[in-house]
C-alpha cells in the first residue's frame, strides 16, 4: 500500500498514529530545478555547469548526487543527463566520481546498468564503479553504547552493488581480472551483509567467491601456503552469510579439507587444519 511504500523509501517517518515527512521535499525540488536549469544553460560546456553549481559550497556534492539519482527513473532523463555526465571526456574527474557515486547509491539504477553496461566495459570504467561502491555506497548510523565511545555502523545501500555483481559474473570479468580480486571480494562481502538480498545476485556473488577460494587453493600448491588464510577468509565469510546459496559448495569444501587432513601429506594436513 501507499503508506508502506512511503515508509520503506524513507519519505515519511511514523510515530504512533502520526506521520511526518522525513525531509523537506520542497527543498529537494528547488535544488532539482536549479541543477536542471544550470545544465540546460551550459549547452554542453560542462565546465560552465560545474563552475555554476560549485557556488553552492560544500553541500553541492551530496545535492548533486541526489540530483543524479533522481535522473534514474525516466529513460529520457537517463539519455539526456547521465550518458554525457558519465562518459564525456570533458567532465572533470572529481565530478565524474560524484556522478558515479550518485548512480550507485540510487535504488533505481538497474535500467541504467542494463542500458550502459557494455559502454562501461568498453570505456574501462567498471572498476571505477566498483571502487566507488566499496568506498561510498553506505549509510551511517551512530550507535551510542552505554559507558563506551559512540560507534558508527555502516550499512550497504543502493542498487549499484548487485548490478555490478551481475555484470562481473555474466561477463566472467572476475576470472579475467584476478588482480582486482580484493575489490571484488569486498563488493560481494558487503552485499552479503545487506538485508534485502536477491537470490539470483547472491548466487552470482557466491559463484565468484567459490572461484576465488578454489583459485587460491591451486595457487597454494606452488607458493607458500600461509598467505592463503588471508586470501580466502573474506570469501568464506561472504559464503557463510549467503549460506542459502552456497550450502552444497561449503559441504563439499569442508569434506575435502577433512579428507586432506586425514589422508594427505604433511603440507595438506597443515593447510587444512589452518583453514578450518
List each model region and its residues.
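Short capping/hinge segments at domain boundaries that bridge a core fold to an adjacent linker or tail
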Residues: 13-48
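Extended amphipathic alpha-helical scaffold segments
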Residues: 15, 39-276
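Short amphipathic alpha-helical interaction segments
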Residues: 1-9
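General structural signal for secondary-structure boundaries
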Residues: 1, 24-27, 91-93
Amino acid at each position: 500500500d501507499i503508506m508502506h511504500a512511503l515508509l520503506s523509501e524513507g519519505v515519511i517517518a511514523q510515530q504512533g498514529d502520526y506521520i511526518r515527512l522525513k525531509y523537506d521535499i520542497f527543498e529537494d525540488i528547488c535544488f532539482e530545478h536549479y541543477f536542471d536549469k544550470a545544465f540546460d544553460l551550459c549547452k554542453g560546456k560542462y565546465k560552465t555547469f560545474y563552475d555554476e553549481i560549485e557556488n553552492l559550497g560544500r553541500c553541492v556534492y551530496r545535492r548533486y548526487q541526489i540530483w543524479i539519482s533522481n535522473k534514474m527513473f525516466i529513460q529520457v532523463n537517463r539519455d539526456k543527463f547521465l550518458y554525457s555526465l558519465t562518459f564525456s571526456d570533458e567532465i572533470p574527474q572529481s565530478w565524474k566520481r560524484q556522478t558515479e557515486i550518485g548512480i550507485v547509491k540510487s535504488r533505481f539504477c538497474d535500467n541504467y546498468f542494463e542500458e550502459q553496461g557494455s559502454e562501461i566495459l568498453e570505456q574501462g570504467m567498471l572498476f571505477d564503479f566498483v571502487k566507488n561502491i566499496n568506498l561510498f555506497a553506505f549509510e551511517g548510523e551512530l550507535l551510542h553504547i552505554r559507558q563506551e565511545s559512540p560507534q558508527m555502523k555502516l550499512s550497504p545501500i543502493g542498487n549499484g552493488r548487485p548490478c555490478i555483481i551481475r555484470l562481473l559474473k555474466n561477463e566472467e570479468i572476475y576470472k579475467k581480472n584476478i588482480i582486482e580480486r580484493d575489490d571484488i571480494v569486498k563488493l560481494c562481502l558487503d552485499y552479503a551483509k545487506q538485508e534485502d538480498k536477491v537470490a539470483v545476485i547472491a548466487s552470482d556473488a557466491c559463484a565468484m567467491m567459490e572461484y576465488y577460494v578454489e583459485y587460491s587453493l591451486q595457487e597454494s600448491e606452488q607458493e607458500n601456503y600461509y598467505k592463503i588464510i588471508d586470501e580466502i577468509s573474506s570469501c568464506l565469510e561472504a559464503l557463510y552469510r549467503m549460506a542459502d546459496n552456497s550450502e552444497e559448495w561449503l559441504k563439499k569444501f569442508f569434506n575435502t579439507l577433512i579428507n586432506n587432513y586425514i589422508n594427505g601429506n604433511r603440507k595438506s594436513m597443515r593447510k587444512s587444519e589452518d583453514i578450518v
